[in-house]
Every structure is written in C-alpha cells, then in structure tokens.
C-alpha cells in the first residue's frame, strides 16, 4: 500500500476511537480496506472521506465513533451503506469510496484475488461475532437427523460456519483442513445428515423461519433486530 498523509490521518483517528469504544468485543478482527493506489487521494488537501459499510454495527461504528472524531479534525464524512458483501469492495476499487469497513481479512483476501482488485487492508476493527441462532428448533439439544442449517454462501464465512458445526460435532471435517478455506468437499462425516443451506448473508436472519438453525453474521443479526445473546 502506498502510504499517504490522508490514510495516515484516517487510520490514526479512526483506529484510536474504535479501540477506545469497542475494545471489549470479540471475533476475528475485520479489516478496513482502502484502494492500494487511491486515484482520488490528494494527500492532506483531501477533506471529504467516503466510507462504505454494511448495515448494522459497522455503520453504527462509523456514525457514532469514527465520524465525530474525524469531523473534529476538519474532515467531512460521507457514509454509504450496502446491503450485501459484494458491492463494497467493487465500489472501493472503482473509486466510489475512500475506504470500507465490513469484512474480515480472509474475506478481503479471497475477494480481491477472485476479482483481481488492487485494494489492501488499512487497519483492523472489532465487530459482533458470527453466531449460530435458533430457527424452528430452539436449543442445541433439539438437533436431530436431517436438521437444516442456513449459512453464508461466501467462501470465507462458509468456512467459519463449517468450523462451528465441526466444533459442535454435527459434522466432522477432514484432518488437517485449513479452517479458513474449508468447504463442503472437506466434510469427512455428517453423522446427523445436516442439510446446509447456503444463502446470501443478508438473507440469513429471515431464513430462520424456514430452517432449524441459522449461522448469521453479527452485523446482519444486529441490523435485523436480533439480540447477540440469542446465539446458542
């Protein structure tokens, strides 16, 4: 990444306030991404910063914590909220955004490789965790042969869901599998015949009415009104 005065200022101000406000939350730290060579970056002369986020805790983080801190330094902050995990990185690469905050680093790495994007991690922030939530069944003890579980359909988050199911003993992954890249092909055993339903992450909260359990990303859980304490 080409380091600029703009991104040095942004990273220092944003990271300081995020860590102060959210340091107690747990999960793999999501990456704030920036264009590796931002065409619109004019160094210290740039005064408007366009953030891209997904709905939920990421947008709230920008509005409640990062934006006030940057405005005190004389910047204008514009927030663009997306309803999916695809458009924020494409918009960043196309120059519509200066920075985005919505993803963890494995997702960023997979996405930019697949789409051949010249974007890079700027800094990391905490977020609400991925969780297994009740659907038609309300407790882990109710799992039965043929139970259905919805999960994110993007590779990195689907891998996290598989690791979660493996830890519960609902499926068994092959020995030595990389937990960051696990896929259905890495399932060695499925003793409960779990039916995994892959969906866009934004659809997972609504899917709970149709499946027995749902693996839901934290930001979409919060934006849909779910309580993180509902996770099993």
Model-flagged regions — what are they?
Residues 17-21:
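C-terminal motif of bacterial Sec signal peptides marking the signal peptidase cleavage site
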Residues 22-34:
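Bacterial lipoprotein signal-peptidase II cleavage site
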Residues 55-78:
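Short, polar/charged alpha-helical segment
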Residues 79-90, 177-206:
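Short helix-initiation/N-cap motifs at beta->coil->alpha
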Residues 93-103, 147, 170, 192-195, ...:
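Alpha-to-beta junction loops
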Residues 122-171:
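A conserved helix-loop-strand patch within extracytoplasmic ligand-binding domains
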């Amino acid at each position: 990444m080409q380091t600029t005065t703009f991104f040095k200022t942004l990273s220092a101000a944003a990271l300081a306030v995020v860590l102060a406000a959210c340091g107690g939350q747990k999960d793999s730290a999501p990456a704030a991404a920036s264009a590796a060579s931002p065409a619109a970056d004019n160094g210290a002369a740039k005064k408007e910063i366009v953030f891209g986020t997904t709905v939920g805790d990421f947008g709230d983080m920008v509005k409640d914590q990062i934006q006030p801190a940057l405005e005190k330094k004389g910047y204008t902050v514009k927030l663009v909220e997306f309803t999916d995990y695809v458009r924020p990185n494409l918009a960043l690469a196309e120059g519509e955004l200066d920075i985005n905050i919505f993803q963890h680093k494995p997702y960023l790495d997979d996405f930019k490789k697949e789409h051949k994007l010249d974007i890079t991690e700027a800094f990391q922030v905490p977020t609400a965790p991925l969780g297994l939530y009740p659907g038609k069944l309300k407790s882990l003890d109710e799992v039965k042969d043929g139970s259905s579980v919805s999960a994110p359909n993007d590779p990195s988050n689907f891998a996290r869901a598989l690791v979660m199911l493996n830890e519960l003993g609902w499926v068994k992954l092959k020995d030595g599998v990389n937990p960051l890249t696990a896929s259905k092909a890495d399932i060695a055993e499925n003793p409960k015949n779990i039916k995994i339903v892959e969906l866009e992450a934004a659809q997972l909260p609504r899917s709970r009415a149709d499946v027995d359990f749902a693996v839901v990303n934290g930001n979409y859980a919060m934006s849909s009104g779910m309580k993180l304490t509902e996770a099993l």
